[in-house]
Amino acid sequence: MKIKVGILGASGYAGNELVRILLNHPKVEISYLGSSSSVGQNYQDLYPNTPLNLCFENKNLDELELDLLFLATPHEFSAKLLNENLLKKMKIIDLSADFRLKNPKDYELWYKFTHPNQELLQNAVYGLCELYKEEIKKASLVANPGCYTTCSILSLYPLFKEKIIDFSSVIIDAKSGVSGAGRSAKVENLFCEVNENIKAYNLALHRHTPEIEEHLSYAAKKKITLQFTPHLVSMQRGILISAYANLKEDLQEQDIRDIYTKYYQNNKFIRLLPPQSLPQTRWVKSSNFADINFSVDQRTKRVIVLGAIDNLIKGAAGQAVQNMNLMFDFDEDEGLKFFANL
């Protein structure tokens, strides 16, 4: 028997990837597409490549008969929308940032709004599947992690958990394709602005910073403050992070490989690459995999960690479906058994 799901925000890039994945999921029926601006428009008119003959509607959510609702909506939307009564009717996976951070003051500092739903904020489960699998299985509200956050945390988590690095020395240099900025029209995302160009942005201000720090703090069992610098590169999709940290001990690469293997050997979507094989965005494009590898610089006594994901799949829609699979006791990789098409 298939579960019935709905999507609010299916017209965006992440929403479209959700539709694409769910149409090929054997245990899911897409029953509702919600929109306030495209009511009556058929989804195929918006995305002719997508075989979904369903029109956008704008119903009161309490009227819907769904097992699960995905929210691929702008920040602040779901924080005002969700309530306990709705969560008694259906499960929710929120792809926005509205329930990712536990400290309400972080929303005032980083997102510039006062969170209106602090009780639900505390009850939401952070949907990083490789770290919080058991909590996700029991959750009614899952906060899907950010794209930079997913790649950064997965790449560094074992080092923080084992406390083998100087936490104050950590620097994350991140690069993302243009789809990470969303589908809405912006001058800075026009072809002539981004083509043949790389630029840094939001220096010391990127909103994924507190998310990364919060969950690496849980791993380290102490408050973490780190440096995160994102860059926009002229490609459609993909994230590559390069992270640097000082080692506290004289460790060899095999020592660190043993640590990563201990944490990730049973995870279906994390690929610890062989020695000397460095992650590339094209190897994870349109897939739910996270590729990770590292090198130890014996001269500087630093570990250099590289991670790559597709920002729209493992960084958004694919991870949301992975969360759904856990919440409904499906195989974790159901509907996600695809790999990069080079």
Curated annotation (Swiss-Prot):
What pathway annotation does it carry? Answer: Amino-acid biosynthesis; L-arginine biosynthesis; N(2)-acetyl-L-ornithine from L-glutamate: step 3/4
Q: Which UniProt keywords apply?
A: Amino-acid biosynthesis, Arginine biosynthesis, Cytoplasm, NADP, Oxidoreductase
Question: Listed disulfide bonds for this chain?
Answer: none
Task: Give a GO molecular function annotation for the protein.
Answer: NADP+ binding
Its UniProt entry gives the catalysed reaction(s) as:
N-acetyl-L-glutamate 5-semialdehyde + phosphate + NADP(+) = N-acetyl-L-glutamyl 5-phosphate + NADPH + H(+)
Q: Where is the active site?
A: C147
**Pfam families according to UniProt:** Semialdhyde_dh, Semialdhyde_dhC_1
Q: Which GO terms describe its cellular component?
A: cytoplasm
Q: What is its EC number?
A: 1.2.1.38
Enzyme class, top EC level, equals: oxidoreductase
The record's subcellular location field reads:
Cytoplasm
Q: Name one GO biological process term.
A: L-arginine biosynthetic process
Q: Which SMART domains match?
A: Semialdhyde_dh (SM00859)
Q: Which HAMAP family match?
A: ArgC_type1
The function of this protein is: Catalyzes the NADPH-dependent reduction of N-acetyl-5-glutamyl phosphate to yield N-acetyl-L-glutamate 5-semialdehyde.
* Protein family according to the UniProt entry: Belongs to the NAGSA dehydrogenase family. Type 1 subfamily.
Q: Which PANTHER family match?
A: N-ACETYL-GAMMA-GLUTAMYL-PHOSPHATE REDUCTASE, CHLOROPLASTIC-RELATED, N-ACETYL-GAMMA-GLUTAMYL-PHOSPHATE REDUCTASE, CHLOROPLASTIC-RELATED-RELATED
What name is this protein filed under?
A: N-acetyl-gamma-glutamyl-phosphate reductase
Name the gene: argC
